[in-house]
């Protein structure tokens, strides 16, 4: 793995091999996180961006949130904490106002181009007006728009391109498993959601076929939440399989994994919930948390 840093003047700096590093993905978090500690012979100039490449392919590109230099008995080290390209949208507020008949093209000119994001993949248009309240981040505006019209979470790839139609599904075939944990949490299962009707009563039941214990919820009309999704979310959260495999398995976004764990069984089509790639004196390995599959 090769790590490069970009200085404030735009010049590049080869950072060398880290003593330790971790790259974290979580489906529920907008940005990936890179944390790395590098040996150094001096205090580095302030870095703006960090890029990690593997065999010519960019694995991570993100903003530097923290740059901490430490002196110990073993010498100087520089710790970097970085977030991927979504951080730019998270850290910037959108200009308050109203956009009539918003489209991705309009949002691109209003929110993205001032931040240097000029390439957008996806199309969407709404017949209503979009009201942006003061203090709302660019990410919140864009994410809500994409989820409402496209049913997908946007993301920024390692080339700085914003994808608004979600990540394509990709197959992960996991080979050797160093360790694994199978966790069942039946307390997360929801047995029934009673949805409020137009008459005001909670008289429309949605039942789970899997729950063995009664755990009931009530859904109001104002919430707008699909009761079937409430049940499905509980089902997803009731199961997790955490595996650790040798090497770097990345990217994980949109991944579905097939894995056979000695003693635990074979698992197919398991969506990736989160993951963490690690580099240290023991080499490279990847920890992946999987949801219930087929």
Language-model features: where?
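Charged- and aromatic-enriched interaction segments used to assemble
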Residues: 76-77, 81-187
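Oligomerization/assembly interface segments of phage tail-like spikes and tubes
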Residues: 22-40, 75-87, 237-245, 272-273, ...
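Surface-exposed cap/loop segments at beta↔alpha junctions
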Residues: 38-118, 285, 292-294
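Short amphipathic beta-strand and strand-loop transition segments with alternating hydrophobic
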Residues: 20-26, 65-71, 275-278
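A broad structural signal for short, well-ordered beta-strand segments within beta-sheet-rich domains
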Residues: 14-20, 64, 125-129, 177-183, ...
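Solvent-exposed edge beta-strands and adjacent loop segments
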Residues: 1-28
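Acidic, small/polar-enriched beta strand-loop surface segments
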Residues: 2-3, 143, 147, 152-294
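Glycine-centered tight beta-turn/hairpin loop motif at sheet-sheet or coil-to-beta transitions
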Residues: 10, 55-57, 264-265
